[in-house]
């Protein structure tokens, strides 16, 4: 794409050089004179004006002029007054170095620039010097119909304002109304464009119906774009492209663009996008793409766009304290690293609140409030998405899933609240090595959808893990939840649950196994911390039954005791226990009856044998 832009720019230069051949470009560059360029005489010493009759171009080659002073030297066919302080321009104006044009409301309240369809080229104002537009209206105009140009397609020819290559001055546009400018042609024809320069101001304007609102590219720097109202653009509202840097975009309102509101492409650096209102744009409210670095997006109100904020192939950007409501995705990071998403309020997203996707790593997502997302509050997906930290976020009220982990590894979720989401709070697919800690679990549902996923839940101090539904969809023995410490775990429906206890206890209750029958057991894979006193209270047992607790270190015979039918297992060891099994050992009833019957028979036989022996003994005594 970068090469494509360069080729397009070179082609534009070629077109311009042909259009202005033997005119002001060559005059300015080489000091050559051509018959079609006429210098205007009888003007002040510090002002230089020329006219190119082939390209219909008024050339300001020195000094400072305004619209009425230009008109006084040319006939009405080029620049004419059509009403009180209202002017119609039917030519190009070119401002060279060391020259300036002032379009001021004091002398030109309205400037209409005609569209010339005869040679398929619009009229334009092109500056390589200084251009000041203040307190005026500049309108694209069709003098034949006496109305704005009818836009049939993006290529419909309309006038434009351009700060050209190697500009030595500034183009300041303030307190003005600019409308119906620009078209999809060559680089710089899009509406209001800066191809070079630094230190310009674009402040407190209303920009309506341009092909592109404002465009900066090719190392443009130190531009302030503030307090503008940009609407109904056929492309972007504000576009920064190709190594633009040190740009401030502050307190603007951009709405109803056909594409994106604000775009930063190809090595844009040190950009501040703050306090803007971005609404009802068909594309993305803010797009940072292809090595856009050190961009700060702060305190913006972003509402009802196809997407809120997207960062792609860029790093070291900050998204903070934004209000993001009713967008497709609230915030989307794709192949982005080391970005920070902090303290945003994201609500009513039609897809994901925050989507971290496709080889995005080392991002920090903290203290965001995410509510009422239709798909997932936070979605983390695709291989290579790893080592991200999610800290202190609130994810609640989603119509589907709260926190979705899809093919990711080694991410940390710390001190988050994931609650009151309709289907699952945690959804885990083909993901491992992810850690949840210091998080509140209350009526939390966790769904595993494949055999190799696991989730570590640790350091949930003073939190109650109760009433939760940990479900293994495919009923394998590989899915794990690791819990540490002080937890009450209920409804263990997976066969392989990991438990991390500490010096307090873990209460495992409501086990979904029948322990009253022989040869049935419950198995957990676990890791007990080294040199820590561990106390397990295992409930849901049958009073009076005998149980065997087997670990990789010891086998204990335990008798269930207490009114709650619990058994208690205390363990202290310097080595890790990684597995224990609980097995019911009570003898089945039919064996018990058989043994009792045999005992009764044996007793009867013994009784009769003893009785017979006694009689024999008595008879022997009588015979003596």
Predicted stretch roles:
Residues 1-31, 176, 225, 249, ...:
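Secretory targeting signatures
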Residues 76-79, 553-566:
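Solvent-exposed beta-strand/loop surfaces of large extracellular or lumenal domains
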Residues 382, 405, 412-466:
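Predominantly extracellular beta-rich ligand-binding scaffolds that present long acidic/polar faces
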Residues 456-507:
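Catalytic cores of secreted or luminal carbohydrate-active enzymes
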Residues 527-544:
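Surface-exposed beta-strand/loop patches in extracellular or lumenal glycoproteins
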Residues 562-585:
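C-terminal beta-strand-rich structural cap/linker in extracellular carbohydrate-active enzymes
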Residues 508, 521-526:
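Short, well-ordered beta-strand segments enriched in hydrophobic/aromatic residues
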Residues 29-274, 278-326, 332, 340, ...:
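Beta-strand/loop edge motif enriched in small/polar residues
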């Amino acid at each position: 794409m970068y090469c494509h832009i360069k080729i397009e720019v070179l082609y534009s230069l070629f077109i311009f050089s042909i259009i202005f051949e033997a005119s002001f470009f060559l005059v300015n560059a080489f000091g050559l004179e051509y018959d079609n360029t006429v210098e205007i005489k009888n003007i002040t010493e510090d002002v230089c004006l020329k006219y190119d009759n082939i390209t219909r171009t008024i050339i300001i080659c020195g000094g400072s002029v305004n619209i009425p002073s230009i008109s006084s030297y040319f006939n009405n066919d080029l620049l004419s007054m059509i009403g009180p302080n209202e002017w119609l321009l039917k030519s190009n104006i070119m401002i060279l170095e060391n020259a300036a044009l002032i379009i001021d409301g004091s002398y030109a309240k309205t400037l209409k620039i005609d569209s010339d369809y005869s040679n398929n080229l619009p009229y334009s104002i092109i500056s390589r010097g200084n251009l000041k537009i203040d307190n005026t209206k500049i309108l694209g105009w069709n003098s034949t119909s006496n109305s704005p140009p009818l836009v049939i397609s993006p290529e419909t020819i309309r006038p434009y304002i351009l700060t050209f290559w190697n500009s030595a001055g500034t183009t300041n546009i303030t307190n003005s109304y600019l409308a119906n400018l620009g078209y999809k042609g060559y680089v710089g024809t899009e509406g209001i464009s800066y191809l070079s320069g630094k230190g310009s101001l674009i402040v407190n304007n209303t920009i309506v119906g341009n092909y592109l609102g404002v465009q900066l590219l090719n190392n443009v720097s130190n531009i302030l774009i503030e307090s503008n109202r940009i609407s109904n653009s056929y492309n972007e509202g504000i576009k920064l492209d190709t190594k633009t840097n040190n740009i401030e975009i502050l307190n603007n309102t951009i709405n109803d663009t056909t594409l994106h509101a604000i775009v930063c492409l190809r090595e844009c650096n040190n950009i501040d996008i703050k306090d803007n209102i971005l609404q009802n744009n068909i594309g993305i409210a803010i797009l940072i793409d292809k090595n856009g670095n050190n961009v700060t997006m702060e305190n913006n109100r972003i509402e009802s766009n196809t997407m809120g904020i997207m960062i792609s192939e860029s790093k070291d950007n900050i998204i903070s304290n934004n209000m993001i409501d009713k967008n497709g995705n609230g915030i989307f990071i794709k192949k982005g690293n080391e970005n920070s998403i902090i303290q945003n309020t994201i609500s009513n997203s039609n897809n994901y609140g925050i989507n971290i996707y496709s080889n995005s790593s080392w991002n920090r997502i903290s203290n965001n409030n995410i509510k009422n997302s239709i798909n997932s509050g936070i979605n983390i997906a695709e291989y290579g998405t790893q080592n991200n930290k999610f800290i202190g976020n609130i994810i609640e009220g989603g119509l589907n899933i709260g926190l979705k982990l899809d093919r990711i590894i080694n991410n940390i979720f710390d001190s988050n609240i994931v609650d009151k989401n309709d289907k699952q709070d945690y959804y885990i697919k083909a993901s491992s090595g992810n850690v949840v800690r210091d998080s509140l679990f209350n009526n939390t549902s966790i769904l595993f959808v494949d055999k190799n996923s696991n989730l570590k839940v640790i350091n949930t101090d003073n939190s109650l893990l109760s009433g939760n539904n940990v479900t293994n969809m495919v009923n394998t023995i590989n899915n794990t939840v690791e819990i540490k410490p002080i937890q009450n775990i209920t409804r263990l429906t997976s066969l392989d649950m990991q438990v991390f206890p500490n010096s307090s206890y873990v209460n495992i209750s409501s086990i979904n196994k029948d322990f009253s029958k022989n040869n049935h057991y419950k198995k957990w894979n676990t890791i007990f911390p080294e040199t820590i006193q561990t106390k397990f209270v295992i409930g849901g047992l049958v009073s009076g039954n005998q149980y065997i607790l087997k670990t990789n270190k010891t086998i204990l015979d335990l008798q269930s005791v207490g009114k709650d039918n619990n058994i208690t297992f205390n363990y202290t060891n310097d080595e890790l226990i990684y597995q224990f099994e609980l097995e019911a050992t009570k003898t089945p009833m039919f064996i018990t009856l058989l043994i009792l019957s045999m005992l009764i028979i044996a007793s009867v036989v013994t009784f009769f044998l003893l009785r017979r022996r006694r009689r024999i003994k008595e008879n022997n005594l009588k015979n003596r």
